[in-house]
Protein backbone atom coordinates (compact mmCIF):
# COMPACT_ATOMS: atom_id res chain seq x y z
CA UNK A 1 0.00 0.00 0.00
CA UNK A 2 2.78 2.43 0.91
CA UNK A 3 4.52 1.54 -2.32
CA UNK A 4 1.44 2.67 -4.19
CA UNK A 5 1.66 6.16 -2.70
CA UNK A 6 5.42 6.64 -2.52
CA UNK A 7 6.64 4.23 -5.18
CA UNK A 8 9.53 1.80 -5.09
CA UNK A 9 13.14 2.71 -4.36
CA UNK A 10 13.98 2.81 -8.08
CA UNK A 11 11.04 5.09 -8.77
CA UNK A 12 12.13 7.42 -5.97
CA UNK A 13 15.60 7.67 -7.54
CA UNK A 14 14.09 8.56 -10.91
CA UNK A 15 11.57 11.00 -9.43
CA UNK A 16 13.77 14.13 -9.55
CA UNK A 17 14.68 13.56 -13.19
CA UNK A 18 11.05 12.91 -14.13
CA UNK A 19 9.90 16.01 -12.26
CA UNK A 20 12.46 18.13 -14.10
CA UNK A 21 11.37 16.77 -17.46
CA UNK A 22 7.66 17.27 -16.68
CA UNK A 23 8.20 20.83 -15.47
CA UNK A 24 10.13 21.79 -18.58
CA UNK A 25 7.47 20.35 -20.84
CA UNK A 26 4.68 22.14 -18.96
CA UNK A 27 6.56 25.45 -19.06
CA UNK A 28 6.94 25.07 -22.82
CA UNK A 29 3.19 24.43 -23.10
CA UNK A 30 2.39 27.53 -21.06
CA UNK A 31 4.74 29.61 -23.19
CA UNK A 32 2.90 28.50 -26.31
CA UNK A 33 -0.46 29.34 -24.73
CA UNK A 34 0.95 32.69 -23.65
CA UNK A 35 1.96 33.47 -27.20
CA UNK A 36 -1.53 32.52 -28.41
CA UNK A 37 -3.19 34.81 -25.85
CA UNK A 38 -0.92 37.67 -26.88
CA UNK A 39 -2.03 37.16 -30.47
CA UNK A 40 -5.70 37.25 -29.40
CA UNK A 41 -5.10 40.46 -27.47
CA UNK A 42 -3.50 42.10 -30.48
CA UNK A 43 -6.40 41.03 -32.73
CA UNK A 44 -9.05 42.38 -30.35
CA UNK A 45 -7.16 45.64 -30.22
CA UNK A 46 -7.16 45.93 -34.01
CA UNK A 47 -10.85 45.04 -34.28
CA UNK A 48 -11.76 47.66 -31.69
CA UNK A 49 -9.88 50.31 -33.67
CA UNK A 50 -11.63 49.36 -36.90
CA UNK A 51 -15.06 49.49 -35.19
CA UNK A 52 -14.35 52.99 -33.92
CA UNK A 53 -13.25 54.08 -37.37
CA UNK A 54 -16.54 52.80 -38.79
CA UNK A 55 -18.52 54.48 -35.99
CA UNK A 56 -19.66 51.25 -34.30
CA UNK A 57 -18.87 51.89 -30.64
CA UNK A 58 -20.77 48.87 -29.28
CA UNK A 59 -18.65 46.45 -31.27
CA UNK A 60 -15.57 48.34 -30.20
CA UNK A 61 -16.55 47.89 -26.53
CA UNK A 62 -17.14 44.17 -27.07
CA UNK A 63 -13.66 43.74 -28.57
CA UNK A 64 -12.14 45.66 -25.71
CA UNK A 65 -13.91 43.43 -23.13
CA UNK A 66 -12.48 40.32 -24.80
CA UNK A 67 -9.11 41.96 -24.82
CA UNK A 68 -9.34 42.54 -21.05
CA UNK A 69 -10.26 38.88 -20.47
CA UNK A 70 -7.30 37.72 -22.52
CA UNK A 71 -4.99 40.08 -20.68
CA UNK A 72 -6.24 38.75 -17.34
CA UNK A 73 -5.58 35.17 -18.46
CA UNK A 74 -2.15 36.22 -19.74
CA UNK A 75 -1.24 37.69 -16.35
CA UNK A 76 -2.32 34.52 -14.54
CA UNK A 77 -0.43 32.43 -17.06
CA UNK A 78 2.72 34.48 -16.56
CA UNK A 79 2.45 33.97 -12.79
CA UNK A 80 2.20 30.21 -13.33
CA UNK A 81 5.24 30.23 -15.59
CA UNK A 82 7.22 32.19 -13.01
CA UNK A 83 6.26 29.72 -10.28
CA UNK A 84 7.18 26.74 -12.43
CA UNK A 85 10.52 28.31 -13.36
CA UNK A 86 11.32 28.84 -9.69
CA UNK A 87 10.32 25.28 -8.84
CA UNK A 88 12.32 23.90 -11.75
CA UNK A 89 15.39 25.83 -10.62
CA UNK A 90 15.01 24.52 -7.05
CA UNK A 91 14.60 20.91 -8.17
CA UNK A 92 17.56 21.11 -10.55
CA UNK A 93 19.70 22.62 -7.81
CA UNK A 94 18.59 19.98 -5.30
CA UNK A 95 19.20 17.21 -7.82
CA UNK A 96 22.65 18.61 -8.57
CA UNK A 97 23.44 18.60 -4.84
CA UNK A 98 22.19 15.03 -4.63
CA UNK A 99 24.36 13.88 -7.53
CA UNK A 100 27.34 15.70 -6.03
CA UNK A 101 26.74 14.01 -2.70
CA UNK A 102 26.50 10.63 -4.43
CA UNK A 103 29.79 11.22 -6.22
CA UNK A 104 31.47 12.26 -2.97
CA UNK A 105 30.04 9.22 -1.21
CA UNK A 106 31.36 6.94 -3.94
CA UNK A 107 34.75 8.62 -3.69
CA UNK A 108 34.80 8.15 0.08
CA UNK A 109 33.83 4.51 -0.34
CA UNK A 110 36.61 4.00 -2.88
CA UNK A 111 39.18 5.62 -0.57
CA UNK A 112 37.94 3.50 2.32
CA UNK A 113 38.31 0.37 0.20
CA UNK A 114 41.82 1.41 -0.84
CA UNK A 115 42.89 2.13 2.73
CA UNK A 116 41.31 -1.04 4.05
CA UNK A 117 44.58 -2.97 3.85
CA UNK A 118 46.79 -0.06 4.86
CA UNK A 119 47.84 1.39 8.18
CA UNK A 120 50.58 3.73 9.37
CA UNK A 121 52.81 0.91 10.61
CA UNK A 122 52.74 -0.82 7.23
CA UNK A 123 53.42 2.45 5.46
CA UNK A 124 56.40 3.18 7.74
CA UNK A 125 57.77 -0.33 7.20
CA UNK A 126 57.45 0.03 3.45
CA UNK A 127 59.20 3.41 3.48
CA UNK A 128 62.03 1.95 5.59
CA UNK A 129 62.46 -0.88 3.10
CA UNK A 130 62.58 1.61 0.24
CA UNK A 131 65.25 3.67 2.03
CA UNK A 132 67.32 0.55 2.71
CA UNK A 133 67.16 -0.49 -0.93
CA UNK A 134 68.14 3.00 -2.06
CA UNK A 135 71.15 3.01 0.28
CA UNK A 136 72.12 -0.48 -0.87
CA UNK A 137 71.91 0.62 -4.48
CA UNK A 138 74.20 3.59 -3.75
CA UNK A 139 76.74 1.34 -2.04
CA UNK A 140 76.67 -1.07 -4.98
CA UNK A 141 77.17 1.79 -7.42
CA UNK A 142 80.14 3.09 -5.45
CA UNK A 143 81.66 -0.39 -5.26
CA UNK A 144 81.28 -0.91 -9.00
CA UNK A 145 82.82 2.47 -9.80
CA UNK A 146 85.99 1.80 -7.78
CA UNK A 147 89.13 0.76 -9.78
CA UNK A 148 90.09 -2.90 -9.68
CA UNK A 149 93.74 -2.08 -8.73
CA UNK A 150 94.18 0.17 -5.73
CA UNK A 151 96.83 2.87 -5.74
CA UNK A 152 98.38 1.52 -2.53
CA UNK A 153 99.09 -1.82 -4.18
CA UNK A 154 101.30 -0.31 -6.87
CA UNK A 155 105.10 -0.66 -6.57
CA UNK A 156 106.63 2.79 -6.16
CA UNK A 157 110.02 1.58 -7.42
CA UNK A 158 108.49 0.31 -10.63
CA UNK A 159 106.74 3.64 -11.09
CA UNK A 160 110.02 5.52 -10.61
CA UNK A 161 111.76 3.29 -13.15
CA UNK A 162 109.00 3.80 -15.69
CA UNK A 163 109.10 7.54 -15.06
CA UNK A 164 112.87 7.67 -15.68
CA UNK A 165 112.43 5.60 -18.83
CA UNK A 166 109.79 8.00 -20.12
CA UNK A 167 111.97 11.00 -19.37
CA UNK A 168 114.88 9.39 -21.21
CA UNK A 169 112.69 8.67 -24.22
CA UNK A 170 111.42 12.24 -24.25
CA UNK A 171 114.96 13.58 -24.15
CA UNK A 172 115.96 11.36 -27.07
CA UNK A 173 112.93 12.43 -29.10
CA UNK A 174 113.52 16.11 -28.46
CA UNK A 175 117.31 15.79 -29.04
CA UNK A 176 118.03 17.37 -25.72
CA UNK A 177 121.28 16.27 -24.14
CA UNK A 178 121.26 15.87 -20.39
CA UNK A 179 122.77 18.81 -18.58
CA UNK A 180 126.11 17.75 -17.02
CA UNK A 181 126.47 18.32 -13.37
CA UNK A 182 128.62 21.29 -12.47
CA UNK A 183 132.10 20.23 -11.58
CA UNK A 184 132.77 20.91 -7.94
CA UNK A 185 135.76 23.16 -7.37
CA UNK A 186 138.00 21.65 -4.76
CA UNK A 187 139.61 24.19 -2.45
CA UNK A 188 143.30 24.64 -2.91
CA UNK A 189 145.39 23.29 -0.07
CA UNK A 190 148.93 24.47 0.45
CA UNK A 191 150.96 21.49 1.40
CA UNK A 192 154.31 21.97 3.12
CA UNK A 193 157.27 21.29 0.93
CA UNK A 194 159.17 18.17 1.65
CA UNK A 195 162.58 19.01 3.04
CA UNK A 196 165.41 17.86 0.92
CA UNK A 197 167.71 16.68 3.67
CA UNK A 198 170.38 14.14 3.21
CA UNK A 199 171.79 12.44 6.19
CA UNK A 200 175.54 12.17 6.02
CA UNK A 201 176.37 9.01 7.76
CA UNK A 202 179.72 7.50 7.32
CA UNK A 203 178.22 4.01 7.49
CA UNK A 204 175.70 4.77 4.60
CA UNK A 205 176.81 2.90 1.54
CA UNK A 206 175.94 3.57 -2.06
CA UNK A 207 173.13 0.95 -2.14
CA UNK A 208 171.25 2.67 0.63
CA UNK A 209 171.66 6.00 -1.13
CA UNK A 210 170.13 4.60 -4.29
CA UNK A 211 167.19 3.18 -2.33
CA UNK A 212 166.52 6.53 -0.71
CA UNK A 213 166.60 8.23 -4.11
CA UNK A 214 163.99 5.80 -5.44
CA UNK A 215 161.72 6.36 -2.43
CA UNK A 216 162.09 10.11 -2.86
CA UNK A 217 161.13 9.84 -6.53
CA UNK A 218 157.99 7.84 -5.64
CA UNK A 219 157.00 10.40 -3.02
CA UNK A 220 157.44 13.25 -5.44
CA UNK A 221 155.48 11.41 -8.14
CA UNK A 222 152.63 10.70 -5.70
CA UNK A 223 152.67 14.32 -4.63
CA UNK A 224 152.46 15.54 -8.25
CA UNK A 225 149.54 13.17 -8.98
CA UNK A 226 147.69 14.42 -5.92
CA UNK A 227 148.27 18.03 -6.92
CA UNK A 228 147.06 17.27 -10.45
CA UNK A 229 143.84 15.70 -9.14
CA UNK A 230 143.26 18.71 -6.94
CA UNK A 231 143.93 21.12 -9.78
CA UNK A 232 146.94 22.70 -8.17
From Swiss-Prot:
GO terms of biological process kind: late endosome to vacuole transport via multivesicular body sorting pathway; vesicle budding from membrane
Localization annotation: Cytoplasm; Endosome membrane
Region called Disordered, residue ranges: 178-232
Keyword Membrane: yes
Membrane topology: Peripheral membrane protein
Compositional bias of kind Basic and acidic residues: 221-232
GO CC annotations, alphabetized: cytoplasmic side of plasma membrane; ESCRT III complex; multivesicular body
Keyword field: Cytoplasm, Endosome, Membrane
Keyword Membrane: yes
Source organism, top-level taxon: Eukaryota
Compositional bias ranges of the Acidic residues kind: 209-220
Pfam families: Snf7 (PF03357)
Biased composition (Low complexity): 178-187
Family matches, as Gene3D superfamilies: 6.10.250.1710, ESAT-6-like
Sequence similarity: Belongs to the SNF7 family.
Role, per record: Required for the sorting and concentration of proteins resulting in the entry of these proteins into the invaginating vesicles of the multivesicular body (MVB). Also required for the proteolytic cleavage of the transcription factor RIM101 in response to alkaline ambient pH.
Subunit structure: A component of the endosomal sorting required for transport complex III (ESCRT-III).
Protein name (database record): Vacuolar-sorting protein SNF7
Protein's organism: Kluyveromyces lactis (strain ATCC 8585 / CBS 2359 / DSM 70799 / NBRC 1267 / NRRL Y-1140 / WM37)
Lineage: Eukaryota, Fungi, Dikarya, Ascomycota, Saccharomycotina
Gene name in the database record: SNF7
Amino acid sequence: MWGYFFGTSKQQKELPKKAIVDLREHIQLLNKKQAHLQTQIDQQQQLAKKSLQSGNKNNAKTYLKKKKLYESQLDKLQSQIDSLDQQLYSIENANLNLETLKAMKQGASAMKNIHKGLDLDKVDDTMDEIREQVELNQEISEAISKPLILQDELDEDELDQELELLESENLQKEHIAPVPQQQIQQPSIDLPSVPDVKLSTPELNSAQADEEDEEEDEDERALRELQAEMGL
